[in-house]
Amino acid sequence: MVVKINENYLKLKSSYLFVEVARREAEFQKNNPDADIIKMGIGDVTKPLAPSVIKAFQGAVDEMGNADTFRGYGPEQGYDFLAEEIIKNDFEPFGVSLDTDEVFISDGAKCDTGNIQEIFDLGNKIAVTDPVYTVYVDTNVMAGRTGEMKDDGMYEGLTYLKCNAENGFVPELPEEDVDIIYLCYPNNPTGTTLTYDQLKVFVDYAIEHKAIILFDAAYECFIREDDVPHTIYEIEGAKNVAIEFRSFSKMAGFTGTRCAYTVVPKEVAGYDSKGNEVQLNQLWNRRQTTKFNGVSYPVQVAAAAVYSDDGKKEIKEIIDYYMENAKVIKSSLEKLGLEVYGGVNSPYIWVKTPNNMDSWAFFDLLLNEANVVGTPGSGFGPSGEGYLRLTAFNTLENTKEAMDRISKLNF
């Protein structure tokens, strides 16, 4: 008698993309201990939490140290005081009304975008953009919705919607019927966006085909242009077909504090084997109350402070700081004659590698010759080959230094 494993895990690539990036970086640092490496790969932030957030955080911790104000287990879905602030500030300004029980507070959009697939049948046909945030793909592989990875880097059973310079990084509708479509805009990794009309095409498809859109809007706060939707629910009919994911990680520096939320409107539904309509809100609530104990009270208080008058001002300054970095990266690389995308409504810059160099070769060149770490585009899918992602989350000083180093390279 032996314990059998979930063999779907064996279908995955040998290591998670960012683990391999970190491994190569660590190996280089070990061999070059004096090298000053500038990290512009993984999307971690460098600015500290805003003062108003810290003040609220500390106040909530003090409450936890007092018997009269101590709080134990909180509601798995999150406290209403935070959900109310989210609705008031993130949705109502765009004409979207929600109830608090449609907002689920969590410890990360990565967790939610990975876990949401649990409420769907394994037989559903999945579509992802290519390149893509790898969590969408890997979690469906783990669940058993795909076959093996083919020689072209694509998994059997997944539908890939190519995004490249030729189509302006706007994915075409799937040629075959699909049940679930993952979209991320502003996009990770390409930094590009969809207009209202372009997003409406997908919403209309989902309505017609009774499909579900899983819409990752983790980078909404970086939107600068007018014709870019801030939430998918600005599109007519989207409440019937879309689940939206948001995060405080990049918006407010919560990468180490952990807080996010998922919106599951009561209108959005799936179907059981008998064809009966089932609210996805109920299923997600059941999943969360079973597997998740909720985000800590101090963290939720800190997140709510993001929406205070002082918090909004402080957060805007931080976001503007990162977007200035993005501007520096984009303009510097364009001056070198490189093709550069993103960086306008997003902290991500998507760079075409010079001289048809492959992604990992360009990664190694920047690491070895400029001591700058990016993320190889091929790690995000076959259509990412020949690109490299840089992030705007380092300091302005380091960002300028990195661009200066790269400008001295001979491509």
Swiss-Prot record:
Its EC number is 2.6.1.83. The modification N6-(pyridoxal phosphate)lysine is found at residue 250. It holds the Pfam family Aminotran_1_2. InterPro entries: Aminotransferase_I/II_large (IPR004839), DapL/ALD1 (IPR019942), PyrdxlP-dep_Trfase (IPR015424), PyrdxlP-dep_Trfase_major (IPR015421), PyrdxlP-dep_Trfase_small (IPR015422). Keywords: Aminotransferase, Pyridoxal phosphate, Transferase. Pathway: Amino-acid biosynthesis; L-lysine biosynthesis via DAP pathway; LL-2,6-diaminopimelate from (S)-tetrahydrodipicolinate (aminotransferase route): step 1/1. Pyridoxal 5'-phosphate binds at residues 73, 109-110, 133, 188, 219, 247-249, 258, 293. GO terms for molecular function: L,L-diaminopimelate aminotransferase activity; pyridoxal phosphate binding. Its cofactor is pyridoxal 5'-phosphate. Substrate binds at residues 16, 43, 110, 133, 188, 293, 389. It catalyses: (2S,6S)-2,6-diaminopimelate + 2-oxoglutarate = (S)-2,3,4,5-tetrahydrodipicolinate + L-glutamate + H2O + H(+). GO terms for biological process: lysine biosynthetic process via diaminopimelate, diaminopimelate-aminotransferase pathway. It comes from the Archaea. Homodimer. Involved in the synthesis of meso-diaminopimelate (m-DAP or DL-DAP), required for both lysine and peptidoglycan biosynthesis. Catalyzes the direct conversion of tetrahydrodipicolinate to LL-diaminopimelate. Belongs to the class-I pyridoxal-phosphate-dependent aminotransferase family. LL-diaminopimelate aminotransferase subfamily. PANTHER family: AMINOTRANSFERASE (PTHR43144). This is LL-diaminopimelate aminotransferase. It comes from Methanobrevibacter smithii (strain ATCC 35061 / DSM 861 / OCM 144 / PS).
